[in-house]
Amino acid sequence: SDLADGTDLNLQPTEELAFAGAHLYAYSYLYDKKVAATDKDVKVTFTIDMKDKDGDDISMNLWMKGEPEREVFTALAPMTEGLSRIPGMPYNIKEQPTLTFVARQHGEAWNRPFVAVYEPSTRKEPSAIEAVSFFDAEEAGLKDFAGICVESKNGRTDHIFSLSDSSQTATYRGMKVKADYAVISNEYAGNRTFFLGNGTQLITPDVSIRTSAAANVLLEQKQGKWYILSSAPCTIMIDGKNVQSGVTSKSTLLAVQ
């Protein structure tokens, strides 16, 4: 476990999780526990040693947004019995402890939610993510909002907006969203992605999606052509040109004149 900038977290041995209260018996099964207090963003990599599979180690990469009054723990837990009964698992579950990460927020967590990005990878199929960062909405009164920027190694950058109330508007660097969830990507190799999740508005300087009722809309540019998948009628604006689209049950070519 490191800070997102690569600095060592300097985790220290702890027994703190063992005394979490009589109602949290599961903590008693954790061992090799270590803790660090930090308000910085954290990057964690869980790695399963795959010596018996040509050394193609399996990793789960985790990026978590930092918050004040937060502690992070690493630990080992007993093997996961349920997973051990699933055929075709990539490693022997019963012979491996479960790699464990715990984040604890002191004080009010509603306005300081746990925000994380997970990405699996192997040595032969390495991580596709270059960097993960987090941003706040420009609306000062918007508290229960999470903003994530994911930069991929292929040149794609995704800005992810998450709100608990889809009637609220979140703005960041010319992007405006009114939805529970939204993804806005840059253009890379003639491709681009916009997703509006249970919302009515997604606006960028050159592309926008508007609906009269909350809807799910996926707008994609593939090799220069635009495709749409929408649960409700919507108005699409691309480079100043408006296009009306009805409900589509599968990805449909959008006629942009």
Model-derived regions: residue spans:
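Trp/Gly-enriched beta-strand surface patches
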Residues: 4-96
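Non-catalytic terminal regions with compositionally biased, polar/charged low complexity
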Residues: 9, 19-21, 37, 99-112, ...
